[in-house]
């Protein structure tokens, strides 16, 4: 755990030192390196003996933990996507992410800062508190992945809604607001950054 956190810290410091001197490919390289170290630390926080996690696998998810992460990230992406549309932004015009294939790259960019406080925290809770069990998953033979079955899927949706509606703080407003409201405020910050030529400040959860 200590070595994984140390490696993640080094990756973050490297990005901070780069400022504007790095290309997008180099920055994406830091992102990939940081993600690998992050999930190495994440795996060591799983204490449920029947769940294991060694590597982030995207499509299709090959184990229950990856399945939960992918499901949660999809729900989070949809929330960010909706707020982008509400502000009149094109969700497909990203800054960090982008490729020839048409995907909602701006939504992917802006959801990054919410993966850990919303989805990863939720997945850890559902596993470690034994709210979900390995028997809540099944193989989807056509897709070749592992997915939640009913009613476990509804359980996840219920807890996701509770998590994204839970209270936190944001420097742009006084008092406690929901994470969903924070997403909206961050999208508004992005609009100001684009229109006003000011730096974008990402959301950092206060613990």
Regions found by a protein language model. Give the residues of each.
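Active-site helix-to-loop segments that bind/position phosphate- or nucleotide-bearing substrates
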Residues: 1-207
């Amino acid at each position: 755990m200590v070595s994984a956190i140390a490696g993640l810290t080094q990756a973050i410091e490297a990005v901070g030192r780069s400022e504007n001197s790095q290309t997008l490919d180099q920055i994406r390289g830091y992102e990939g390196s940081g993600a690998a170290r992050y999930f190495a630390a994440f795996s060591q926080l799983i204490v449920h003996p029947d769940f294991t996690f060694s590597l982030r696998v995207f499509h299709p998810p090959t184990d229950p933990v990856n399945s939960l992460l992918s499901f949660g990230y999809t729900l989070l992406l949809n929330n960010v996507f909706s707020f982008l549309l509400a502000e009149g932004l094109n969700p497909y015009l990203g800054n960090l992410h982008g490729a020839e294939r048409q995907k909602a790259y701006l939504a992917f960019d802006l959801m990054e800062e919410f993966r850990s406080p919303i989805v990863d925290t939720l997945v850890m809770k559902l596993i470690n508190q034994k709210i979900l069990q390995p028997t809540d998953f099944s193989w989807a033979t056509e897709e070749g992945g592992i997915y939640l079955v009913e009613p476990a899927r509804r359980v996840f949706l219920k807890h996701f809604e509770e998590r994204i509606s839970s209270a936190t703080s944001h420097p742009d407003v006084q008092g406690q607001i929901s994470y969903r409201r924070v997403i909206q405020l961050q999208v508004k910050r992005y609009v100001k950054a684009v229109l006003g030529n000011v730096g974008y400040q990402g959301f950092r959860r206060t613990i």
